[in-house]
Amino acid sequence: MKQYLDLMKHILAEGVDKSDRTGTGTRSVFGYQMRFDLSKGFPLVSTKKCHMRSIIHELLWFLKGETNVAYLRENKVSIWDEWADDNGDLGPVYGAQWRSWPTQSGDAIDQISQVIAQIKSQPDSRRLIVSAWNVGELDKMALAPCHAFFQFYVADGKLSCQLYQRSCDVFLGLPFNIASYALLTMMVAQQCDLALGDFVWTGGDTHLYSNHMEQTALQLSREPMPLPTMTILRKPESIFDYQFDDFELTNYAPHPHIKAPVAV
């Protein structure tokens, strides 16, 4: 994951110091892109240990269309707890927008089902898009979508995906985001009988929090390890039928975990 370390170096060298919503302060750049060939390994950061179990459960939670943290808590995943209300609700965040985007007529659009059907029937379409950025519901969300918009692309029998992330916590959040969307691309490719292409990550306000600088320096002192392999052990009938045990990560030999505070 040299690309990830290069981004950190770029922010430190070229970034500007900015204030932010959380009051923590950041060093930030605007507009950055990374590309990962998914046929060459699974893009999981190795210069610190990443919690793949949380990444998988969060993605399955999104795909269920759920917006209450009960499922996550049942599976010992606490990454959304800081934003949940007393009942565990987050408002109409990612899962709601992916699976039940509300229309003016009172209906709902299942964007995930829709985009998979489009990939199968119209692979050359330039409208293979899923958006979580619903302007009409932002004020109801506990946290506005950071990874806001993604697009699929089919060429030469391979599926690629590009994510636009309007705001990115590079130290804590980005390793999760890259792995999550790489895994989603693998799942969609399997459902559509396509080979793996690239995952392209595009960042808007791409930042390191001021209280992550020591952790960033430690991570930059470490050598990245070879990419691990992610295997999907079965092909269920639907994108919504995957279970945690369907995924097997092998040859992941990361450096030790690095703890850092979350900016809420």
From Swiss-Prot:
GO cellular component terms, A-Z: cytosol
Q: InterPro entries per the record?
A: Thymidate_synth/dCMP_Mease, Thymidate_synth/dCMP_Mease_dom, Thymidate_synth/dCMP_Mease_sf, Thymidylate_synthase, Thymidylate_synthase_AS
A Gene Ontology biological process annotation? methylation
Record-annotated residues binding (6R)-5,10-methylene-5,6,7,8-tetrahydrofolate? H51, D169, A263
Q: Which Pfam families match?
A: Thymidylat_synt (PF00303)
Pathway noted in the entry: Pyrimidine metabolism; dTTP biosynthesis
Q: Where are the disulfide bridges?
A: none
Reactions catalysed, semicolon-separated, are: dUMP + (6R)-5,10-methylene-5,6,7,8-tetrahydrofolate = 7,8-dihydrofolate + dTMP
GO MF assignments: thymidylate synthase activity
* List of residues binding dUMP: R21, R126, R127, R166, S167, C168, D169, N177, H207, L208, Y209
Q: What is its EC number?
A: 2.1.1.45
Q: Tell me the compartments it is located in.
A: Cytoplasm
Any idea what job this protein has? Catalyzes the reductive methylation of 2'-deoxyuridine-5'-monophosphate (dUMP) to 2'-deoxythymidine-5'-monophosphate (dTMP) while utilizing 5,10-methylenetetrahydrofolate (mTHF) as the methyl donor and reductant in the reaction, yielding dihydrofolate (DHF) as a by-product. This enzymatic reaction provides an intracellular de novo source of dTMP, an essential precursor for DNA biosynthesis.
Q: Which NCBIfam families match?
A: PRK01827.1-3, PRK01827.1-5, thym_sym
Protein name per UniProt: Thymidylate synthase
Species source reads: Shewanella baltica (strain OS223)
